[in-house]
């Protein structure tokens, strides 16, 4: 077990959920808990959100769905965003998982298993309105409109789409996608709809439809949401170095003065990117401390020379992620996004869930 502690504030996640629910008003709000709840624990987060009446949980794969179903029981809907494949269709049926069907081939597979089981099988349809990732194409949607037998045997519960640039509120592409989505929905007047991801919720009620599907905003990856994550690491080694001493692999940092250098027990094997070498920072008692030298697999060095002497001791905790250094802020240093910071968090951390 790592000496580092990853604290996940469940109350903050629940408060974020309730804030989003308040914005959505009459629309339902689900939760994207794929990639193990963005690295924070899908089961723990889902159980907490169930207490706030969340009933829709979105995962990426059937494996994620099965694990969640085993933990949560049958009282919630679990949606598999990557859809259904020949090899996992029976597993989806056994564990009451609902696939989001992304193309005619997946519809065909699900229809085949509906015939085998002699019953309707639940599904969502994903219409591609412009993100051009997953989703039925315009030609495929037209085929569905003209031949409803293509959906025979399927219990179509929702039609969804996904916004490509919802974090940019004024980007006209959002409205373009909305209008395309609405045009398709006219042909399915009795089917519920879902469009808004986290950013989409903040675009206004026109984007909310029947169900919103936030992920990032639940986990604090939005300026108005509360950060629920704190990652701390203790100082495990201290050394006094003289002027012109080299630090770390390839000697990429050289001291410009007599320095006190501390070592922390985490590295790129724990999801702390090598790109932070010589440019990241941590915080000790609210004071910024620079990272010096290369990030190693299991270790990083920090320059604590400017800290008060009483703050420099073995076991002193440094905050890697927290209110001083949120995932979004950290991500901006190395040109990535907060999603990647969270989902990269390694399995060695001691995870503590607090209310």
Curated annotation (Swiss-Prot):
Residues with PTM N6-(pyridoxal phosphate)lysine: 34
SMART domains: Ala_racemase_C
Gene Ontology MF term list: alanine racemase activity; pyridoxal phosphate binding
Binding residue positions for substrate: 133, 297
Active-site residue list: 34 (proton acceptor), 249 (proton acceptor)
Family, similarity comment: Belongs to the alanine racemase family.
Protein name per its UniProtKB record: Alanine racemase
GO biological process: D-alanine biosynthetic process
Catalytically driven reaction(s): L-alanine = D-alanine
Keyword terms: Isomerase, Pyridoxal phosphate
GO cellular component: a single term: cytosol
Biological role stated in the UniProt entry: Catalyzes the interconversion of L-alanine and D-alanine. May also act on other amino acids.
Top EC class, one word: isomerase
UniProt cofactor(s): pyridoxal 5'-phosphate
Pathway: Amino-acid biosynthesis; D-alanine biosynthesis; D-alanine from L-alanine: step 1/1
Top-level lineage group: Bacteria
EC number, UniProt record: 5.1.1.1
PROSITE patterns: ALANINE_RACEMASE (PS00395)
Keyword Isomerase: yes
NCBIfam families referenced in this protein's UniProt entry, alphabetically: alr (TIGR00492), PRK00053.2-3 (NF000792)
